[in-house]
């Protein structure tokens, strides 16, 4: 109810300003051909009724790959991504994450396998090892790297964070982002009617 009430409040405020609202819940794996479970509400507002009438959200597209096809299991990442033997929690994660075919979701310290072939929703809280997307590669159990997280959000390969951004903050920014291809498709629909 909280999400709906928040949306209703925002909708009323925007409508009171003279805009026509269009919104739709869209999942990255359904609208971007990226295997990430990420459903978000996208809102488009028009000041012109005719433009609003001609706008339509993009149609779903088929998902053609599984998350683990996007991961190079034979490529070692920096040590910062790997769970060690140093703590009870790290040992628990290493013992739990056993299947190399899936990405696991660690949330509030508990690991759960996602057998749907998708990457779990990338969130701002994934900046900590207790809330992360985790997998087993040829070298051990680790979190998704920043680059892999950017890929699952649809960022172009040439995108890089400045060296001044801490890894913790970069994960937060990725988790707070919307998937780039979904926004691009919505923008293309807006451009089509303008």
Regions found by a protein language model. Give the residues of each.
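Single conserved hydrophobic/aromatic residue that forms the stacking wall/gate
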Residues: 1-14
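Short histidine/acidic/glycine/proline-rich micro-motifs that form metal-
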Residues: 4, 28-33
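Conserved S-adenosyl-L-methionine
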Residues: 19-30
């Amino acid at each position: 109810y909280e999400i709906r009430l928040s949306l209703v409040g925002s909708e009323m405020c925007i409508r009171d300003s003279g805009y026509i609202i269009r919104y739709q819940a869209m999942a990255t794996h359904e609208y971007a051909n990226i295997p990430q479970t990420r459903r978000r509400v996208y809102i488009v507002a028009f000041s012109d009724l005719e433009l609003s009438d001609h706008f339509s959200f993009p149609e779903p597209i088929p998902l053609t790959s599984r998350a683990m096809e996007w991961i190079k299991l034979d490529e070692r990442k920096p040590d910062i991504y790997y769970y060690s033997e140093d703590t009870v929690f790290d040992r628990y994660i290493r013992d739990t994450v056993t299947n190399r075919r899936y990405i696991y979701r660690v949330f509030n310290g508990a690991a759960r396998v996602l057998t749907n072939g998708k990457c779990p929703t990338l969130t701002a809280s994934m900046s900590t090892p207790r809330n992360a997307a985790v997998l087993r590669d040829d070298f051990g159990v680790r979190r998704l790297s920043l680059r892999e997280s950017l890929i699952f959000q649809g960022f172009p390969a040439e995108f890089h964070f400045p060296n001044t951004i801490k890894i913790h903050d970069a994960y937060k920014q990725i988790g707070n982002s919307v998937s780039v291809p979904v926004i691009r498709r919505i923008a293309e629909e807006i451009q089509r009617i303008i």
